[in-house]
């Protein structure tokens, strides 16, 4: 094992990729608040370099954490000493990354049309942006591309607009990939874009939606982070901005919105995966959406898509006070989840962010809801932790297909219940 580790580290140095040989993902089961607090203490020990995939929220909710090889025994000993049970969900993270790379390398042929594009594999930013351009070229009467800004590192932030005409019509916003390592979301976003062009004029529900509203789809919401996951660190979550006074890079773009910014549910530590940034909208990736939504002024539904955990969430994240539209949002979430489950039997839970998972301040949909966008939802796609952020490419299309049924339900309701 030691020889393998040395070889892997040398290869990583040559190719620039961070190595995860021997890293394990543990599922921790905290049975009471005291055990949850112990895990939180573990989380604060930065020298352990733990990467929490599912945070310690409250007793009874699973906690998933990636543990580097050098600290795995210390972490297990800590848990065992405090009688906190755990199981190994992923034995070796690098082996899954190697499988992922091998699968991607087998499908590297450049598509000359969106029909030839491979929707059952993961793609780079350049490939996704080329796909977007192809889609616009093939469907100029339905699809256009808008650049709403540029990233910290200077990449374009592109959004697809699906419209049957008119100006400033009521609209629906969908974004995927705000957390860069959640690859199944960007892949699903690509599939959604193609699905819209295939179904308009053929499928009555989508046709009625687009005859009444525009759809904006941002497939890669965090381009810098996404490129970094491909070139350097597959597990990168945040943006790539620099924080003055810290060597740690990036901000959690789902804690950077001007909705209870700085309250519990986000971190002030620049090295944390949930670092909120120095001020609201500090990240250009967030500010670009804020400016677009504000200037548009007629967005009626806002749907932000993440992975993993199989959840459909609505406001609030920062307070347990029920949202004014909680009853309607809850019923709509139930209908959307029912539609999703009907295809492949995938089970989703639904509810407000704070009641269903944890307290989160500065989140996307708390801000959009505060701007009067009633139908504000966050999805957490497959799975529930068996593979986590490393979902096999074979699950991309089934994930996108079932999620689309939930999206259709929300969009159809939005059209039929104007406000």
From Swiss-Prot:
It is found in: Secreted. Residues 121-414 form the Peptidase M14 domain. Binds 1 zinc ion per subunit. It is an enzyme of class 3 (hydrolase). Residues 17-110 form a propeptide. Disulfide bonds join 248-271. Monomer. Belongs to the peptidase M14 family. This is Carboxypeptidase A1. It comes from Mus musculus (Mouse).
């Amino acid at each position: 094992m030691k020889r393998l580790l040395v070889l892997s580290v040398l290869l990583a140095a040559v190719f620039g990729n961070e190595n995860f040989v021997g890293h394990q993902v543990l599922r921790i089961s905290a049975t009471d608040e005291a055990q949850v607090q112990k895990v939180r203490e573990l989380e604060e020990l930065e020298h352990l370099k733990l990467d929490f995939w599912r945070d310690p929220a409250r007793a009874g909710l699973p906690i998933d954490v990636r543990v580097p090889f050098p600290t795995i025994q210390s972490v297990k000993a800590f848990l065992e000493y405090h009688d906190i049970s755990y199981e190994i969900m992923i034995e070796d993270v690098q082996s899954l990354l190697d499988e992922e790379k091998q699968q991607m390398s087998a499908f590297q042929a450049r598509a000359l049309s969106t029909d030839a594009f491979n929707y059952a594999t993961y793609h780079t930013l350049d490939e996704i942006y080329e796909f977007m351009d192809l889609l616009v070229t093939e469907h100029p009467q339905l699809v256009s591309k808008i650049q709403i800004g540029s990233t910290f590192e200077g990449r374009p932030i592109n959004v697809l607009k699906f419209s049957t005409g008119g100006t400033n019509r009521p609209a629906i916003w969908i974004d995927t990939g705000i957390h860069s390592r959640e690859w199944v979301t960007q892949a699903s976003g690509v599939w959604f874009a193609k699905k819209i062009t295939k179904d308009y004029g053929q499928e009555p529900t989508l046709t009625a939606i687009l005859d009444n509203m525009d759809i904006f789809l941002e497939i890669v919401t965090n381009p810098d982070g996404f490129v970094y996951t491909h070139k350097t660190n597959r597990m990168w979550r945040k943006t790539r901005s620099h924080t003055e006074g810290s060597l740690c890079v990036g901000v959690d773009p789902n804690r950077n919105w001007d909705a209870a910014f700085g309250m519990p549910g986000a971190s002030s530590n620049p090295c944390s995966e949930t670092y909120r940034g120095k001020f609201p909208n500090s990240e250009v990736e967030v500010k670009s959406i804020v400016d677009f939504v504000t200037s548009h002024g007629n967005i009626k539904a806002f749907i932000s898509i993440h992975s993993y955990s199989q959840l459909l969430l609505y406001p609030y994240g920062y307070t347990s006070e029920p949202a004014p539209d909680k009853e309607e949002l809850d019923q709509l979430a139930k209908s959307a989840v029912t539609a999703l489950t009907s295809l492949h039997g995938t089970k989703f839970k639904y509810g407000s962010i704070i009641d269903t998972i944890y307290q989160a301040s500065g989140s996307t949909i708390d801000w959009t809801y505060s701007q009067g966008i009633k139908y504000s939802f966050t999805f957490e796609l497959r799975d529930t932790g068996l593979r986590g952020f490393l979902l096999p490419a074979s699950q991309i299309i089934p994930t996108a297909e079932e999620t689309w049924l939930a999206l259709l339900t929300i969009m159809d309701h939005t059209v039929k219940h104007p406000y």
